[in-house]
Amino acid sequence: MAASLSSEVHSLGQLLIDPGKPLPLRFRALFTLRNLGGAEAIDCIGRGFQDESALLKHELAYCLGQMKDRRALPVLKQVLQDRQQEPMVRHEAGEALGAIGDPEVLELLREYAQDPVIEVAETCQLAVSRIEWLQKNPDSPDTNPYLSVDPAPPAEEKDVPTLRATLLDETCPLFHRYRAMFALRNIGGEEAVLALADGLQIGGSLFRHEIGYVLGQMQHKAAVPGLSAALERFEENPMVRHECAEALGSIAHEDCLKALRAHVGDGERVVRESCEVALDMHDYENSGDFQYANGLSQICEQI
């Protein structure tokens, strides 16, 4: 790595772990490090797991998984095994291990597929299924238009009502329901969005949280009522509410602002922090800036 870039990576890493900096700015530093990649960026991200913000640590694990770099495996294993970490953080570490997809982690994932925390257990079960599917389908084309590494490949089915039926069938294996979920996302359009939004009413917390995530990716205004309703359900798992808040920020329709602003003082830290970050994303989506994680030209100026 060139000396100047290495210096900027170091500066971004320092910003990332500085609890005195605004959380949206730290998020921008994180996503810039993810985009830069490499061992030094991974090391910088890995140092953030001592933070007090579960939301930030969750995003650290997410980014490490999206980077698909084996050098992130040690820190992700450690986070998954650390029962002092919040369930949503451990879950994301397990999902990231599945995203990297190295069969080396199968034994560990099978062990934690029996974890007493249901969100962690289900995540590890999905990760095992994903890696095993990849082993059986090594040449399967990547048809994901969103460029994300997903916890399950999309189903081959293209009929929205059929996919909706699978998605909402709680007797169906979770991996198959996830495959229907990502197929609906890839198909897109209002019918698919509304089918997915129906999933916010059923299933476990992990399932509903993933629904929120994919609706955020789709950025369709038809998802706003369902996401807003989930955010407003105080009895809902904070893991779900936070994902719905981030999705509303990604959609960036004017109707999203009201819901987000109503919860910037929420009693759940992860929810109010998600609303803070989501409002920053909303500003970006409406600003015309080229890239949200524009750290090298803007973020470093604020360090």
From Swiss-Prot:
Fe cation 1 binds at H58, H242, E243. InterPro entries: ARM-like, ARM-type_fold, Deoxyhypusine_hydroxylase, HEAT_type_2, PBS_lyase_HEAT. Fe cation 2 binds at H91, E92, H209. Gene3D superfamilies: Leucine-rich Repeat Variant (1.25.10.10). Its cofactor is Fe(2+). It catalyses: [eIF5A protein]-deoxyhypusine + AH2 + O2 = [eIF5A protein]-hypusine + A + H2O. One of its GO terms (molecular function) is iron ion binding. HEAT-like PBS-type repeats lie at residues 56-82, 89-115, 176-202, 207-233, 240-266. Its EC number is 1.14.99.29. It comes from the Eukaryota. Keywords: Hypusine biosynthesis, Iron, Metal-binding, Monooxygenase, Oxidoreductase, Repeat. Binds 2 Fe(2+) ions per subunit. Pathway: Protein modification; eIF5A hypusination. Residues 139-158 are annotated as: Disordered. One of its GO terms (biological process) is peptidyl-lysine modification to peptidyl-hypusine. Belongs to the deoxyhypusine hydroxylase family. Catalyzes the hydroxylation of the N(6)-(4-aminobutyl)-L-lysine intermediate produced by deoxyhypusine synthase/DHPS on a critical lysine of the eukaryotic translation initiation factor 5A/eIF-5A. This is the second step of the post-translational modification of that lysine into an unusual amino acid residue named hypusine. Hypusination is unique to mature eIF-5A factor and is essential for its function. This is Deoxyhypusine hydroxylase. It comes from Xenopus laevis. The gene is dohh.
